[in-house]
């Protein structure tokens, strides 16, 4: 069953990355690899949030967690594309842009991961909490 979770997550992540990258590249064409940068940072934010939330607050089986993180987010984000795009910038003698991409990706990834962890640990609002613990018939 674990392999099914990984396969479904991987499929969803890869297809999601393809469509989102295509959309971003149509909106903002240019020499800076914005689509990969946005996708990778979004994946770091989601990874920090999902891992923290499912380990600290939400009861979730390890197979589903692995399908969401390793499967979906692993396929959604892409270190290999980041590496190829950085190499193309260097080969095209766009060294300042390549260095910006490297720094923005590494620092941004760490910041987004920590932000996801922070968001997952925010206390639930009293209204949201009361709606969770109040039964359908209105009794607590």
UniProtKB/Swiss-Prot annotation:
Belongs to the fluoride channel Fluc/FEX (TC 1.A.43) family. Na(+) is not transported, but it plays an essential structural role and its presence is essential for fluoride channel function. GO terms for cellular component: plasma membrane. It comes from Moorella thermoacetica (strain ATCC 39073 / JCM 9320). The keyword Membrane applies. This is Fluoride-specific ion channel FluC 1. The keyword Cell membrane applies. Its main location: membrane.
């Amino acid at each position: 069953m674990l392999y099914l979770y990984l396969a479904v997550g991987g499929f969803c992540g890869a297809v999601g990355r393809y469509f989102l990258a295509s959309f971003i590249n149509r909106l903002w064409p240019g020499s800076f690899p914005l689509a990969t940068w946005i996708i990778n940072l979004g994946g770091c934010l989601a990874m920090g949030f999902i891992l923290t939330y499912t380990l600290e607050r939400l009861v979730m089986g390890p197979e589903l967690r692995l399908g969401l993180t390793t499967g979906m987010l692993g396929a959604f984000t892409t270190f290999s594309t980041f590496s190829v795009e950085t190499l193309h910038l260097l080969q095209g003698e766009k060294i300042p842009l390549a260095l910006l991409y490297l720094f923005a990706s590494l620092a941004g990834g760490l910041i987004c991961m920590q932000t996801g962890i922070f968001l997952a640990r925010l206390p639930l609002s009293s209204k949201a909490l009361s709606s969770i613990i109040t039964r359908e018939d209105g009794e607590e």
